Curated annotation (Swiss-Prot):
Disulfide bonds: none annotated. It comes from Macaca nemestrina (Pig-tailed macaque). This is Cystic fibrosis transmembrane conductance regulator. Glycans are attached at residues 894, 900. Residues 81-365, 859-1155 form the ABC transmembrane type-1 domain. The gene is CFTR.
Length: 1481
């Protein structure tokens, strides 16, 4: 970054913001880069600001029982805040004085006051000086308040982040990541720009008092008629605001539903294409979009009328103020024009500035209270340890995940023993206690000496991970003692990759040791992987390391743990994603050799690991089932395998767990009869044993970020799913959400995301930060993609302005959505932005406007209609202006005031009635036309948004994976959330405002030109100057705004990344390091934002300066050239003031339109994406009776029409080459082999060798060359969907979308309930589905969170059975499966797919042993394709991977003697992420 010119700028340069000229010049000439941005002043650095606020907050905490964050903020920022407030007030006072001077100028042209004509020029000078003073006061005040708001935001950002790193795991278990991001984005953005409006709470009352005093002098008591009308108008607008809020609340749920499905579709687009569900997903989303748009139109109409009421209220304010006085006493034109000017200022103050100020204070205080509550939450406490100890000891340790459950448990047992009966509430509490109150660990005892290896094994949910958490201090023991040295290194079960290079991920802030680093790389088998990258270990990993395979991520995480020099190494199932051979090598070289002298605790279920361990600890349901050596285990516990993992016992154990899951489901979900679904409230209910529901409680927490995460229940049946209110003395919202219920009644307009009715309680555990840390990489990496940006407030006052400050107020919400990407370093930051900067020009092109206008053919006619109506309004206005300026002299005898040649004076009752009849008639006409002029435009523009959404959705669904792979999931989702929200809400009214303002300016200029042609000459260069200034500024401002919005990404990415790896951070003690990285990201964003604010102020000040010059010219031209007639002078000066304020507004509005049209450009970019080859067609044909066929009838010229294809499943692959992107490096090269019908083929290869890629190539999801034939039909001769329908797929990443069981199994609704139940029986799903209310109509949400991983795999298996596919592709189907589900899948494969061709990619040897042929892939090519006997006889990868015990199983006749030896101990199963979550780790 460059050194800022601000540091050496003079006072004048700072006052006029001239120091920003270099960046404006550069931005106009070329595209700005991060290196062009200026460094921030030291006073704005996150380090200094956070230290300052943290010091005051600590002082507040130490001095008071009830600390207040606002007191700490006051001590930091109050005096500067008040100084700029006083400047703002003085600037606003000049607005009240200007009409006085205008009235005096008009009065000087009174024929009876010719002696005052000489002072008109001095009055004109005074009027111009007022504008100059106002400019010099207003802009520094606004900028100063912006600056303070920015500093407050930075300080609180840092304070919240530091607190987040200190929160206890129990607190994190109750807070969702969406709530944390919302706390930062939604609430803190209120300070950034809204602070400039806060002072109007006290400025407006003073201003109204001053104005009413001045109007009283003119009109006396009738002045209060206009004020009364304004108050009524404000109340009317408040009513419209509430109506708009009601529609928005109703619409919120529909938007949530649409974005739930859309986000799930985007995350699983590969599965959608593999299943051929494009049409089904498109239909589901479009149906939701239709309902959403109905409510969108209603909200838009109400908002339109709200805005129109302000525009056309000016007529009636003046009318009601002047009419009573005119009818009683008559009135001169000077008072009319002066009153008009006063009323303009008064109207803005009452209906705009004051409501905005009240809203700002309400929002700001609410945000401060939320942050204050968050900052007082319980912190993580490190355990006491002794650095001199060399052993790890745990004595009688018991622990609960639920805070305070240790005491509650003892109390509950005591109460239960004292009395046999209890009331309903107590029995409810105790009945649910087994689920929530059971200790996760109880009476654990072990001791290991230095250098020993302790292997921890056990069934799912036994407490293995919790044991490690307790050693690290994340889980506080309720009783017992833990003893260790405190120097800990940790490897998480789910690989955590931070943004940065591979080297940075491994070193992790520890001092670099070349020898140690190379030793770790070799031991963790990373050398070969690193050598494949051009940048070696300096390659940047983004989006959670998605450029790496799961095995590579796991090895990097292990290398990080091993690289740190510690006394105790905690390894939590580090080998889960590794193939068998790699796992063996790493265990030997890394765990057994490299760390031989270190104390290690390894969570594992592999028999080979147990044999090598010095001590073994087996946990079962939180208790110690066995502790000792392996030989002792065989002697003392020969039944341990069957006890824990035997299928008979496991069936019972699994049934108990399923009951627990069901109990939890029933606790979280309750049935709500046939009551209508209300998306504006989330009800929390108690599900008691009696079946009665607890009292409903409204909770309208608005959390747009969570709506992107997993928004809310997708309700498609009369069932209403609700959370449960758990028994607790503490208020539920305090325990479950850091965003309290204080946001009820907020009106929120979605920006990047959408309105949400708050995090549903049923998913709070799934959405908690603790769950985020225990989420698998494949699922966890999608969380940060879905985080969204800030929403904006829509105050009860409509969106309109007349002054620069009010224009600014309107821009209050023009925030570009926060989009999270992965990078911290400045050089690499641009590589991780969601939106490609190079593809979107800095300024919207004319082609985009033209294309947007022609999307809907009626839009052009609507624009013509608006123009015609406007011309009629101008004609009507000219009638009034002509009459006011040319009122004929009245008969002296009928005069109220006896004057000769008294022009433009209303004298008699007859003439006054005549004038006001015309005025009212014209006003009514204008009101009627104005109200309905824009409705067709708003309606049509929403229709255009509907069309663009449909086209974009269709384009994304039909785009090839090679194109989608180059896009970030968050970027795609932003198009459907942020950009569609802009097209729906902001763009229609902004375009209407701009068109209306532009026409008003044109009309006013025309009127002035008719009255005084010389002024028209001055107007032309001013308009040209405005246009040139706008073009000059727009180039730079849009680029700075883009850089600013992209600069937000690292902030929120860093937050999410830190939370995902929080246990690792704490174990390594790297909190200060990550705080430094967070401050660096904050400073980068601050540099962009501060420069944007400065250049914006430069532009606004230049507009004001041009306006002042123009007004000076108009004033002196009108004073010097106008002869007799005060009417002409009054009209010219009044219109001149209104022209320039309106033109200034129009210029700003045009910038807004250009900024919003960038969303249209991005949508068009997605619409123009290439499509996959072959247009999708219906793959089934109905029978004669109209029922859909259960098999696919091929539509191909090479096959007879009556043939059913595929019939056998024979598959031939010839010279297949696959690439991820067109022109990229081949992932697979020259693959050729043939599979016979009904054959089972296993794919073998190291992690990352291309096994899953080959399965994707079969489905034509990649760029492929070569040929594949199925039953003699080439893939080039049929459509894409017909080809994919030939395959059944069980993918590695299970896809469960939000919808009913029926929809998930049969989205096209081809099968009857009987057929679905039959298949559910075959795959073992019936018992699972029947446990849920509604059975097949039960709505699954949050990726099917109530189902275990195994049940989700069974869902995929059921889909394949229903598809009647002849070729089945299985990609790691048994990964993380329990034995019961695994046996069901094996049985189903043998029965339902007995005559099908099966291609299996699997790490479990026992599953591979059932295959007849094996395809070995190495270095992107086929190395071997033989039967199992040949592979075992040769030296191959398969021979190395298979163990002697597996050979015994495969060929028992070769080793008959060994069959009689001691029974082999089966391997314990790995735990799964879903099951870990269900059992609280």
């Amino acid at each position: 970054m460059q050194r800022s010119p601000l540091e050496k700028a003079s006072v004048v340069s700072k006052l006029f913001f001239s120091w920003t000229r270099p960046i404006l010049r550069k931005g106009y000439r070329q595209r700005l880069e991060l290196s062009d941005i200026y460094q921030i002043p030291s006073a704005d650095s996150a380090d200094n600001l956070s230290e300052k606020l943290e010091r005051e907050w600590d002082r507040e905490l130490a001095s008071k029982k009830n600390p207040k964050l606002i007191n700490a903020l006051r001590r930091c920022f109050f005096w500067r805040f008040m100084f700029y407030g006083i400047l703002l007030y003085l600037g606003e006072v000049t607005k009240a004085v200007q009409p006085l001077l205008l009235g005096r100028i008009i009065a000087s042209y009174d024929p009876d006051n010719k002696e005052e004509r000489s002072i008109a020029i001095y009055l004109g000078i005074g009027l111009c000086l007022l504008f100059i003073v106002r400019t010099l006061l207003l802009h520094p005040a606004i900028f100063g308040l912006h600056h303070i708001g920015m500093q407050m935001r930075i300080a609180m950002f840092s304070l919240i982040y530091k607190k987040t790193l200190k929160l206890s795991s129990r607190v994190l278990d109750k807070i969702s990541i969406g709530q944390l991001v919302s706390l930062l984005s939604n609430n803190l953005n209120k300070f950034d720009e809204g602070l400039a409006l806060a002072h109007f709470v006290w400025i407006v009352p003073l201003q109204v008092a001053l104005l009413m005093g001045l109007i009283w002098e003119l009109l006396q008591a009738s002045a209060f008629c206009g004020l009364g009308f304004l108050i009524v108008l404000a109340l009317f607008q408040a009513g419209l605001g509430r109506m708009m809020m009601k529609y928005r609340d109703q619409r919120a749920g529909k938007i949530n539903e649409r974005l739930v499905i859309t986000s799930e579709m985007i995350e699983n687009i590969q599965s959608v294409k593999a299943y051929c569900w494009e049409e089904a997903m498109e239909k589901m989303i479009e149906n939701l979009r239709q309902t959403e748009l109905k409510l969108t139109r209603k909200a838009a109409y109400v908002r339109y009328f709200n805005s129109s009421a302000f525009f056309f209220s000016g007529f009636f304010v003046v009318f009601l103020s002047v009419l009573p006085y005119a009818l009683i006493k008559g009135i001169v034109l000077r008072k009319i024009f002066t009153t008009i000017s006063f009323c303009i200022v008064l109207r803005m103050a009452v209906t705009r500035q004051f409501p905005w100020a009240v809203q700002t204070w309400y929002d700001s205080l609410g945000a401060i209270n939320k942050i204050q509550d968050f900052l007082q939450k319980q912190e993580y406490k490190t355990l006491e340890y002794n650095l001199t100890t060399t052993e790890v000891v745990m004595e009688n340790v018991t622990a609960f995940w639920e805070e305070g459950f240790g005491e509650l448990f003892e109390k509950a047992k005591q109460n239960n023993s004292n009395r046999k009966t209890s009331n309903d509430d107590d029995s409810l509490f105790f009945s649910n206690f087994s689920l929530l109150g059971t200790p996760v660990l109880k009476d654990i005892n072990f001791k290991i000496e230095r250098g020993q290896l302790l292997a921890v094994a056990g069934s799912t949910g036994a407490g293995k991970t919790s044991l490690l958490m307790m050693i690290m201090g994340e889980l506080e023991p309720s009783e017992g003692k833990i003893k260790h040295s405190g120097r800990i290194s940790f490897c998480s079960q789910f690989s955590w990759i931070m943004p940065g290079t591979i080297k940075e991920n491994i070193i992790f802030g520890v001092s670099y040791d070349e020898y140690r680093y190379r030793s770790v790389i070799n031991a963790c088998q990373l050398e070969e992987d690193i050598s494949k990258f051009a940048e070696k270990d300096n390659i940047v990993l983004g989006e959670g390391g998605i450029t790496l395979s799961g095995g590579q991520r796991a090895r990097i995480s292990l290398a990080r743990a091993v690289y740190k020099d510690a006394d105790l190494y905690l390894l939590d199932s580090p080998f889960g994603y590794l193939d068998v051979l790699t796992e063996k090598e790493i265990f030997e070289s890394c765990v057994c050799k490299l760390m031989a002298n270190k104390t290690r605790i390894l969570v594992t279920s592999k028999m080979e690991h147990l044999k090598k361990a010095d001590k073994i600890l087996i946990l079962h349901e939180g208790s110690s089932y066995f502790y000792g050596t392996f030989s002792e285990l065989q002697n003392l516990r020969p039944d341990f395998s069957s006890k824990l993992m035997g299928y008979d016992s496991f069936d019972q154990f699994s049934a108990e767990r399923r009951n627990s899951i069901l109990t939890e489901t029933l606790r979280r979900f309750s049935l709500e009869g046939d009551a209508p679904v209300s998306w504006t409230e989330t009800k929390k209910q108690s599900f008691k044993q009696t079946g009665e529901f607890g009292e409903k409680r409204k909770n309208s927490i608005l959390n747009p970020i969570n709506s992107i995460r997993k928004f809310s229940i997708v309700q498609k049946t009369p069932l209403q799913m609700n959370g449960i209110e758990e028994d607790s003395d503490e208020p539920l919202e305090r325990r479950l959400s850091l965003v309290p219920d204080s946001e009820q009644g907020e009106v929120i307009l979605p920006r990047i995301s959408v309105i949400s009715t708050g995090p549903t309680l049923q998913a709070r555990r799934r959405q908690s930060v603790l769950n985020l840390m225990t989420h698998s990489v494949n699922q966890g990496q999608s969380i940060h993609r879905k985080t969204a940006a800030s929403t904006r407030k829509v105050s009860l006052a409509p969106q309109a302005n007349l002054t620069e400050l009010d224009i600014y107020s309107r821009r209050l919400s023009q925030e570009t959505g926060l989009e999270i990407s992965e990078e911290i370093n400045e050089e690499d930051l641009k590589e991780c932005f969601f939106d490609d900067m190079e593809s979107i020009p800095a300024v919207t092109t004319w082609n985009t406007y033209l294309r947007y206008i022609t999307v809907h053919k009626s839009l052009i006619f609507v624009l013509i209609w608006c123009l015609v109506i406007f011309l009629a309004e101008v004609a009507a206005s000219l009638v009034v202006l002509w009459f006011l300026g040319n009122t004929p002299p009245q008969d002296k005898g009928n005069s109220t005031y006896s004057r000769n040649n008294s022009y433009a004076v209303i004298i008699t009752r007859t003439s006054s009635y005549y004038v006001f009849y015309i005025y009212v008639g014209v006003a009514d006409t204008l009101l009627a036309m104005g109200f309905f002029r824009g409705l067709p435009l708003v309606h049509t523009l929403i229709t255009v948004s509907k069309i663009l959404h449909h086209k974009m959705l269709h384009s994304v669904l039909q785009a090839p994976m090679s194109t989608l792979n180059t896009l970030k999931a968050g970027g795609i989702l932003n198009r459907f959330s942020k950009d569609i929200a802009i097209l729906d809400d902001l763009l229609p009214l902004t375009i209407f405002d701009f068109i209306q303002l532009l026409l008003i300016v044109i009309g006013a200029i025309a009127v002035v030109a008719v009255l005084q042609p010389y002024i028209f000459v001055a107007t032309v260069p001013v308009i040209v100057a405005f246009i040139m200034l706008r073009a000059y500024f727009l180039q730079t401002s849009q680029q700075l705004k883009q850089l600013e919005s992209e600069g937000r990404s690292p902030i929120f990415t860093h937050l999410v990344t830190s939370l995902k790896g929080l246990w690792t951070l704490r174990a390594f003690g790297r909190q200060p390091y990550f705080e430094t990285l967070f401050h660096k990201a904050l400073n980068l964003h601050t540099a962009n934002w501060f420069l944007y604010l400065s250049t914006l102020r430069w532009f606004q000040m230049r507009i004001e300066m041009i306006f002042v010059i123009f007004f000076i010219a108009v004033t002196f031209i009108s004073i010097l050239t106008t002869g007799e007639g005060e009417g002409t002078v009054g009209i010219i000066l009044t219109l001149a003031m209104n022209i320039m304020s309106t033109l200034q507004w129009a210029v700003n509005s045009s910038i807004d339109v250009d900024s919003l049209m960038r969303s249209v450009s991005r949508v068009f970019k997605f619409i123009d994406m290439p499509t996959e080859e072959g247009k999708p067609t219906r793959s089934t044909k109905p029978y004669k009776n109209g029922q859909l066929s259960k098999v696919m009838v091929i539509e191909n010229s090479h096959v007879k029409k009556d043939d059913i294809w595929p019939s056998g499943g024979q598959m031939t692959v010839k010279d297949l080459t696959a690439k991820y992107t067109e022109g990229g490096n081949p992932i697979l090269e020259n693959i050729s082999f043939s599979i016979s019908p009904g054959q089972r083929v296993g794919l073998l290869g190291r992690t990352g060798s291309g096994k899953s890629t080959l399965l994707s190539a079969f489905l034509r999801l990649l760029n492929t060359e070569g040929e594949i034939q199925i039953d003699g039909v080439s893939w080039d001769s049929i459509t894409l969907q017909q080809w994919r329908k030939a395959f059944g797929v069980i993918p590695q990443k299970v896809f469960i979308f939000s919808g009913t069981f029926r929809k998930n199994l049969d989205p096209y609704e081809q099968w009857s309930d009987q057929e679905i139940w039959k298949v559910a029986d075959e795959v073992g799903l019936r018992s699972v589905i029947e446990q849920f209310p509604g059975k097949l109509d039960f709505v699954l949400v949050d990726g099917g969170c109530v189902l275990s991983h195994g049940h989700k795999q069974l869902m995929c298996l059921a889909r394949s059975v229903l598809s009647k596919a002849k070729i089945l592709l299985l990609d790691e189907p048994s990964a993380h499966l329990d034995p019961v589900t695994y046996q069901i899948i094996r049985r189903t494969l043998k029965q339902a797919f007995a005559d099908c061709t099966v291609i299996l990619c699997e790490h479990r040897i026992e599953a591979m042993l059932e295959c007849q042929q094996f395809l070995v892939i190495e270095e992107n090519k086929v190395r071997q394709y033989d039967s199992i006997q040949k592979l075992l006889n040769e030296r191959s990868l398969f021979q190395q991977a298979i163990s002697p015990s597996d050979r015994v199983k495969l060929f028992p006749h070769r080793n008959s003697s060994k069959c009689k030896t001691q029974p082999q101990i089966a391997a314990l199963k790995e735990e799964t992420e879903e099951e870990v979550q269900d059992t609280r780790l």
